[in-house]
Amino acid sequence: ERVAGLGGVPYVRVPDAKRALPHLAAALHGYPSERLRVVGVTGTDGKTTTSFLLAHVLGARRETGLMSTAAVRLGGEELGLEGHFTTPEAPEVQAFLARCAASGATHAVLESSSHGFSQHRLDAVAYAVGVVTNVSPEHLDHHGTFAAYVDAKATLVRRAATAVLNRDDAGLDAFAAAAGEAGARVVTYGQSPGVDARLLRVAEPRGALELTLDLLGERVVARLPMVGRYNAWNAAAALATAVLEGVPADAAAAALASFPGVPGRMQVIATTPFTVIVDFAHTPPALAKAL
């Protein structure tokens, strides 16, 4: 059956355009995620900061791209593609990955949202690693139930070869189960005994965090120029992932010291007679931690 009015224009008729589009976009660009190490970062809170931290630490040793809510970058270049959505539509995602691959980058960090998975924007991305920061109820207007929201986010660990999970978060079990069923390697972080990247000490001198970690068997000390104790967990996730991707533990820890921060994420603006902090705490747990 032909579509009326198209004349001689070639077209392909598919049952679901949303499902077909990411695969067509990936094919158009030569399946770029297969030429990169793609790390996805998801979670209710902390995914933007963790994505920035990871791109910074990886970028100290390797050319790395970053696509997030707050910025889209390749190496030190701002690409100016940021928009309203955490995860853009599939053609933009694939074009970004293709640009990373063409530039000689080895890694791309994608902030990966539940909407991005449920609306198939990320269907044709081959993930090497999936990082989950935490999970609490959000976007129930879209997903309908908390279980459906968690299941959408768990798509990341079902498709990644390695899952990096927050052992201290109450929602860990669902992601660990999904990763296990998919045969993914599970690496944990947090303060709980027995984790792979354990926060042994978190100190909060003015304007910074000082961290001592057992980082996949190696003890390291790191200084992060950010406020907010919860950012220690974001840093632990980034460090663990960077080490898994071949960055030496001491080099990864040292890279945190030069982290420039994230626009609108515990961003400190020193003024007189008071200090201004700009943050995006949009859920009850995030607001409680920020305050």
Model-derived segments and their meaning:
Residues 70-92:
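P-loop NTPase switch/communication element
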Residues 21, 54, 58, 235-245, ...:
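Buried hydrophobic packing segments
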Residues 282-291:
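AMP-binding/adenylate-forming catalytic core of the ANL superfamily
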Residues 28-34, 61, 79-83, 93, ...:
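Conserved adenylate-forming
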Residues 279:
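Conserved phosphate/oxyanion-binding catalytic-loop motifs
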Residues 1-40, 49-61, 194-198, 205, ...:
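Short, basic phosphate-binding NTP loop
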Residues 61-75, 112:
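Short beta-strand-centered segment that lines the nucleotide-binding/catalytic pocket of NTP-utilizing
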Residues 3-8, 102-105, 110, 118-122, ...:
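Acidic, Mg2+-coordinating active-site environments of NTP-dependent enzymes
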